[in-house]
């Protein structure tokens, strides 16, 4: 059997009656992987196979925590922008905010200050192996109403949004 017949992630989630044999070295009984309504199950019952847990970098966590301190809920455009700037999917950002709100409410019920439980950016939030990284953006400048020149926001990505007549302009050099 080829590898694609073993991996449930390579099969179509839209085919609700799809079934594939798992490894042939199971001697006691043949197990089948069944996909029903988008849920992957062994022998048609039991626990779902879950995607692996997302591991966030210290920079991503710092930016997510900083944004959560500003607002606990993101509008769709804000979520899309934050996800793109951090190299995450919108779903990952959405789930992170849901989990953070849940943790925040749980800490409030326990009577502790939820802001104290979060490590301060740039201190314990970074592991010993993580280099000190600059913030993704300077929120303090934008919060004070300081106007920024056009195309200065995230210069590394500004060329994605340029119109066709701007293609002749000099793009920032990546280091």
UniProtKB/Swiss-Prot annotation:
Region (Disordered): 1-31, 109-131
Composition skew (Low complexity), residue ranges: 119-130
Gene Ontology cellular component terms for the protein in this record: nucleus
Domain of life: Eukaryota
Entry's Gene Ontology molecular function annotations: DNA-binding transcription factor activity, RNA polymerase II-specific; sequence-specific double-stranded DNA binding
Name of the featured protein: Homeobox protein DLX-6
DNA-binding region residue numbers: 49-108
Subcellular location: Nucleus
Positions with biased composition (Polar residues): 1-20
Family from the record: Belongs to the distal-less homeobox family.
GO biological process: anatomical structure formation involved in morphogenesis; embryonic limb morphogenesis; epithelial cell differentiation; head development; inner ear morphogenesis; positive regulation of epithelial cell proliferation; roof of mouth development
Keyword tags: Developmental protein, DNA-binding, Homeobox, Nucleus
